[in-house]
Amino acid sequence: MSQSVESRTRIKSERYESGVIPYAKMGYWDADYVIKETDILALFRITPQPGVDPIEASAAIAGESSTATWTVVWTDLLTACDLYRAKAYRVDPVPNVADQYFAYIAYDIDLFEEGSIANLTASIIGNVFGFKAVKALRLEDMRMPVAYLKTFQGPATGLIVERERMDKFGRPFLGATVKPKLGLSGKNYGRVVYEGLKGGLDFLKDDENINSQPFMRWRERFLYSMEGVNKASASAGEIKGHYLNVTAATMEDMYERAEFSKEVGSIICMIDLVIGYTAIQSMAIWARKHDMILHLHRAGNSTYSRQKNHGMNFRVICKWMRMAGVDHIHAGTVVGKLEGDPLMIKGFYNTLLESETDINLPQGLFFAQNWASLRKVVPVASGGIHAGQMHQLLDYLGDDVVLQFGGGTIGHPDGIQAGATANRVALESMVMARNEGRNYVAEGPQILRDAAKTCGPLQTALDLWKDISFNYTSTDTADFVETPTANI
């Protein structure tokens, strides 16, 4: 028996009247929404178009990143639409900025495929960033529920196992990127690796854009690099490594290169962020299976993470990459040549290293996060750093980091090995001073000068680079406090 007209009318309600109605009226705004433990939460910075109410703009973002389209569709009635609609539940004005708002949005966990960064991002950063109702949109932070995190592998190796494997404790790891990054022959490339490791570094590294070019094919680079690693390890009596970049055009090529890196004895391989989320997860699974450390270079991230009003904050990338399963990720230096506000970088490092984080608005952490026992990712600091900044680096970044001195090693006038030695002595003298209870931050320059009295390479480095720094105001700074961005 067919439904009566009266019954159909009751079911339709105002929400399902045909045509275009506001997103907030369609159910994508709910100021009284009670957050579930299993909800995925997102915090967007929105800049509505003139005349667009911020609540309606927030509801539109919630709708377009979950189930909505531009008009009412009756097929919503065939779904558990009240459950599957994302709900914007809170809108706050951004402090000290006109016409920008923080929009809090909750998503039911069943909107997302288990263990898939690609599926998560297809919704959260999909079509919404081109939506006309907002002039600009930025994803600032997310909270992943424990139930969702448990569907991800997490870091292939993790900080604790990496320290055990490297037999390095109580200090940062030391590394360097081979320079020039492009153009060297395989034999010369391998010699750079050897000299850096022989001088005292723990790691040498391929750069993001060295893959398999005419001047040096990948297999040649791998063989010569590992020859340098093995000779330096035997000479120093220490475990050392070189990040072999396996980034390639296809997954088949990447697996081939990764397999070869394992065959020739490497303990670590490397990929670039630009290969995409599915490829990153695939390589992390491979690395876990083959007992390899997996380094991720964040190549390309600043195209969408640097501008404050549009794109995506790097802390979100940190969260996704911890879920995806990388062991290292470049996360800023504070004092180097690349973008890096001190508080923002502290938030990045805490996201990668802590088992649980609380809300910390000065660091940009809008949600408390329990990491469900996923392993820790080692942050990497690289780009424009040198031995004379060692006290600042140790103060800002702590022990659980890889300090990579590329130009600060290879640019040493007495040679690569001397540059590496300068960095190793600078680090060990600073760690010793700290462990003795000295105020190593205030006394840092004097500690370095004292160490240089018995280390010629360090004295040369201090004379050459002195207090060189890159004092530019960061574009991505805290919204809730003023922070220094100069290298002081």
UniProtKB/Swiss-Prot annotation:
Organism ancestry: Eukaryota, Rhodophyta, Bangiophyceae, Bangiales, Bangiaceae
Enzyme class, broadest EC rank: lyase
PANTHER family according to UniProt: RIBULOSE BISPHOSPHATE CARBOXYLASE (PTHR42704), RIBULOSE BISPHOSPHATE CARBOXYLASE LARGE CHAIN (PTHR42704:SF17)
Name of the protein: Ribulose bisphosphate carboxylase large chain
Keyword Protease (UniProt): no
Active site residues of this protein: 179, 297
Function statement: RuBisCO catalyzes two reactions: the carboxylation of D-ribulose 1,5-bisphosphate, the primary event in carbon dioxide fixation, as well as the oxidative fragmentation of the pentose substrate in the photorespiration process. Both reactions occur simultaneously and in competition at the same active site.
Record-listed substrate binding positions: 127, 177, 181, 298, 330, 382
Enzyme Commission number: 4.1.1.39
Gene3D superfamilies for this protein: Ribulose bisphosphate carboxylase, large subunit, C-terminal domain, RuBisCO large subunit, N-terminal domain
Residues recorded with modification N6-carboxylysine: 205
Keyword Transport part of the UniProt annotation: no
GO MF annotation terms: magnesium ion binding; monooxygenase activity; ribulose-bisphosphate carboxylase activity
Record's keyword terms, sorted: Calvin cycle, Carbon dioxide fixation, Chloroplast, Lyase, Magnesium, Metal-binding, Monooxygenase, Oxidoreductase, Photorespiration, Photosynthesis, Plastid
Positions of Mg(2+) binding: 205, 207-208
Swiss-Prot/TrEMBL site (Transition state stabilizer) positions: 337
Co-factor note (free text): Binds 1 Mg(2+) ion per subunit.
Reactions accelerated catalytically: 2 (2R)-3-phosphoglycerate + 2 H(+) = D-ribulose 1,5-bisphosphate + CO2 + H2O; D-ribulose 1,5-bisphosphate + O2 = 2-phosphoglycolate + (2R)-3-phosphoglycerate + 2 H(+)
Needed cofactors: Mg(2+)
Protein origin, superkingdom: Eukaryota
Primary localization: plastid
Subcellular location(s) per record: Plastid, Chloroplast
Subunit annotation: Heterohexadecamer of 8 large chains and 8 small chains.
GO cellular component, one term: chloroplast
Family: Belongs to the RuBisCO large chain family. Type I subfamily.
Intrachain S-S bonds: none
